[in-house]
Amino acid sequence: MQYLPIFLNIRGQQCLVVGGGTVAVRKVALLRQAGAEVKVIAPKLHEQLQEWADKGKITAQQASFSETEIKSCYLVIAATDDSSLNEQVYHLATAQGVLVNVADCPRFCDFILPSIVDRSPVIVAVSSGGASPVLARLLRARLETLIPQAYGRLGQFAARYRSRIKQRITGIRARRIFWEKVLQGSIAERIFAGQEEEAEGALEAALEGGFVPEQGEVYLVGAGPGDPDLLTFRALRLMQQADVVFHDRLVSPEVLALVRREAERIYVGKKRSWHAVRQEEINMMLVRSAREGKRVLRLKGGDPFIFGRGGEEIATLAAENIPFQVVPGITAASGCASYAGIPLTHRDHAHACIFVTGQLKEGRLSLNWQALVQPQQTIVVYMGLSGLEILCQELIAHGMPAVTPAALVQQGTTSRQRVLTGTLATLPDIVQGEDIHAPTLVIIGGVVALYPQLAWFKVPDREPLDAR
């Protein structure tokens, strides 16, 4: 180990930055974040440095560096493009016993500045010892995706209770186990969900009882349209800590594969005219699993609040006093349209966009047709495959031109994506002649005409299908 990883408290300490360019701006910003009193000296100052100086946030002097500037400084950073000046700063600082760092020159550094993941008060520092700053930045980027932003709030919460827990639980091992349950369980999830009062109440009860009870919770998570790269960080974190997952048929196999391997998987999907499990029973299955102390993942394709019946599920959970949180997902309209190269709004084609469901009821579609046939508007139809012919006929009958461009997207954003395009008059026959597999999405409006120019996503071994 070439360097000892340590954290310095420089709050209120005088720190000097020699240099006035973009590198100096980055160093000054970092020192300011840590609460240092920063002085900058350079013949010419970057406009950002000058702005900070004008606002009294730093002290800046437009002058050449002199040895006297180092006196009374806690640390010095040389960030000029003059290597001989940087070396001079290094030798003068070390001679006076002042910590010094020369930017991008490890051999003239008493300390190095790592790549930082900031979740204050939790700080993660990553360093390659100056060997490869790019590698350190790449590692930091990976860590940024793994550590929730709310860890800062969790750290502050833990700090408030540290002394009390130490007094209440005197055994080191017992205290460690207690903290592990707090920081990895439902109390931490309350913090992540912004429910600090509930977290405090649960921790107070745990302190009173001397143990952290196992409390179940439901995660209602949007799985997006299919491509696992479109999952949110929060969704992925909850997927990987669930004990049981209830999923529907709209969740792609690629997304389902990212759920914690040990989690029990229960299929509760629905197909047209066939329901595996009634919605009311799904609601109560979530309740029962949570009451067993399980972390319950309810994984839904797209977004749980857009034609996903998520509102019904959390209404039941709320009525049964089951803790829950909702994680939005990229809805199929947005995801499929983007991957098909069909913008839902466009200055020249559509100033509005409307989402509707195309499910048939007793062979009919109950929609507000007058609202749908407005000009310069895009219509996105979820679950519209079975009623596509009726949909197109009704739109034409209510005044929409038969030549209006229309598209059907099959299994959008995945390697099984297909795009069929036509018009209101021709699309039903085009689709009828193809082997189409759900889930599908129908897009209607002038924006569909842009598809041939804007289609960018290429399915492996198959070009997007334009069956006009």
UniProtKB/Swiss-Prot annotation:
The keyword Iron does not apply. The active site is at residues 248, 270. PROSITE patterns: SUMT_2 (PS00840). NAD(+) binds at residues 22-23, 43-44. Its EC number is 2.1.1.107, 1.3.1.76, 4.99.1.4. One of its GO terms (biological process) is methylation. S-adenosyl-L-methionine binds at residues 225, 301-303, 306, 331-332, 383, 412. InterPro entries: 4pyrrol_Mease, 4pyrrol_Methylase_sf, 4pyrrole_Mease_sub1, 4pyrrole_Mease_sub2, CobA/CysG_C, NAD(P)-bd_dom_sf, Siro_Cobalamin_biosynth, Sirohaem_synt_dimer_dom_sf. Residues 216-468 are annotated as: Uroporphyrinogen-III C-methyltransferase. Pathway: Cofactor biosynthesis; adenosylcobalamin biosynthesis; precorrin-2 from uroporphyrinogen III: step 1/1; Cofactor biosynthesis; adenosylcobalamin biosynthesis; sirohydrochlorin from precorrin-2: step 1/1; Porphyrin-containing compound metabolism; siroheme biosynthesis; precorrin-2 from uroporphyrinogen III: step 1/1; Porphyrin-containing compound metabolism; siroheme biosynthesis; siroheme from sirohydrochlorin: step 1/1. The modification Phosphoserine is found at residue 128. Keywords: Cobalamin biosynthesis, Lyase, Methyltransferase, Multifunctional enzyme, NAD, Oxidoreductase, Phosphoprotein, Porphyrin biosynthesis, S-adenosyl-L-methionine, Transferase. It catalyses: uroporphyrinogen III + 2 S-adenosyl-L-methionine = precorrin-2 + 2 S-adenosyl-L-homocysteine + H(+); precorrin-2 + NAD(+) = sirohydrochlorin + NADH + 2 H(+); siroheme + 2 H(+) = sirohydrochlorin + Fe(2+). Residues 1-203 are annotated as: Precorrin-2 dehydrogenase /sirohydrochlorin ferrochelatase. Pfam families: CysG_dimeriser (PF10414), NAD_binding_7 (PF13241), Sirohm_synth_M (PF14824), TP_methylase (PF00590). GO terms for molecular function: NAD binding; precorrin-2 dehydrogenase activity; sirohydrochlorin ferrochelatase activity; uroporphyrin-III C-methyltransferase activity. It comes from the Bacteria. The keyword Lyase applies. Then it catalyzes the NAD-dependent ring dehydrogenation of precorrin-2 to yield sirohydrochlorin. Finally, it catalyzes the ferrochelation of sirohydrochlorin to yield siroheme. In the N-terminal section; belongs to the precorrin-2 dehydrogenase / sirohydrochlorin ferrochelatase family. In the C-terminal section; belongs to the precorrin methyltransferase family. HAMAP family: Siroheme_synth. This is Siroheme synthase. It comes from Nitrosococcus oceani (strain ATCC 19707 / BCRC 17464 / JCM 30415 / NCIMB 11848 / C-107). The gene is cysG.
